């Protein structure tokens, strides 16, 4: 059967699961680099070009079944894999683990499975129990597609389901965005505004918080240990305006869990001058207002960070400096 016929058959079989594309989750800082580069790169290429800021997976092993995973771009078939529970969101107490502080979802066209160099792992590619198929026909027949798309509440000790949910498609080296990227999904309006402030308007940008875990994530006790769900806070939305020589900002958080984080509001002028406000939150509100006197005759950018991770990117109309750094 030709690759196209195999694809049509696979698409028909997976219709019951609502298969809508190939999913690549990454941190916002990586997303900016991907958009500016115009391509999704393998880990090796991204590191070589100094474009990889945060990694969703920091395991040392990069070789599986003789395949150097760092030489491939990697995609999931369904959203919210178990891997995301370990890495999504700004963690109140970071311990050097895998981290995706501000998650962004890039959705690529399904037809990429027809790439003649594609590799199909029936689970997490770095799991020693996963098997790799080098052709679409075999993957279509042998992979546990029901398990891949299952999103029922998972028993932490169910290693099989955890592995299979993370089934991956691997494509070598790089995948161009042009003609292949079909959607960019953000968790919040704040993330969408940040993206537009940096790379401009894009009709592919959308918001769908159901594609993320939002508050829900696991601590690092390990599968089968005494795990609990954490609350990872972030900015939901913000509005910034200027009245005379005063900058006014209204912003809201996803949770009132604020005191566990270090907060920094910062204005940076084109000359390099900065104004910093290290705010302490002792209330339980999620919506806040801030006013700051500014030097109005000089271009400036505004940032807001928690635990050192920037959650607001805003620029005055006359700003001509770099964006997204």
Question: How would you describe each model-predicted region?
Answer:
Residues 1-74, 79-325:
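Active-site-proximal loop/hinge segments that shape catalytic or ion-binding/gating pockets
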């Amino acid at each position: 059967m030709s690759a196209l016929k195999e694809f049509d058959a696979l698409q028909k079989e997976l219709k019951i699961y609502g298969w809508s594309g190939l999913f690549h989750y990454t941190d916002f800082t990586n997303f900016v680099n991907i958009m500016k580069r115009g391509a999704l790169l393998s880990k090796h290429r991204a590191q070589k070009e100094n474009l990889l800021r945060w990694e969703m997976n920091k395991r040392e092993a990069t070789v599986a079944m003789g395949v150097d995973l760092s030489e491939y771009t990697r995609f999931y078939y369904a959203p919210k894999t178990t891997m995301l529970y370990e890495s999504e969101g700004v963690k109140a107490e970071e311990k050097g683990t895998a981290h995706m502080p501000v998650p962004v979802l890039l959705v690529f066209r399904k037809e990429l499975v027809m790439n003649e160099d594609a590799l199909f792992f029936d689970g997490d590619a770095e799991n020693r129990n996963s098997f790799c198929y080098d052709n679409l026909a075999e993957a279509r027949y042998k992979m546990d597609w029901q398990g891949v798309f299952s999103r029922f509440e998972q028993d932490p000790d169910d290693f099989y389901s955890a592995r299979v949910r993370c089934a991956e498609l691997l494509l070598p080296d790089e995948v161009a965005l042009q003609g292949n990227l079909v959607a960019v999904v953000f968790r919040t309006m704040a993330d969408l505004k940040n993206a537009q402030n940096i790379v401009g308007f894009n009709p592919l940008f959308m918001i769908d918080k159901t594609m993320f875990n939002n508050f829900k994530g696991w601590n690092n006790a390990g599968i089968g240990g005494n795990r609990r769900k954490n609350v990872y806070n972030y900015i939901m939305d913000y509005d910034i305006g200027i009245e005379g020589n005063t900058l006014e900002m209204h912003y809201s958080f996803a949770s009132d869990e604020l005191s566990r984080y270090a907060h920094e509001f910062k204005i940076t002028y084109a000359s390099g001058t900065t104004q910093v406000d290290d705010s302490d939150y002792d209330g339980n509100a999620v919506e806040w207002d801030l006013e700051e006197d500014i030097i109005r005759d000089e271009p400036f950018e505004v940032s807001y960070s928690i635990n050192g991770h920037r959650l607001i990117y805003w620029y005055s109309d006359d700003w001509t400096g770099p964006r997204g750094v």
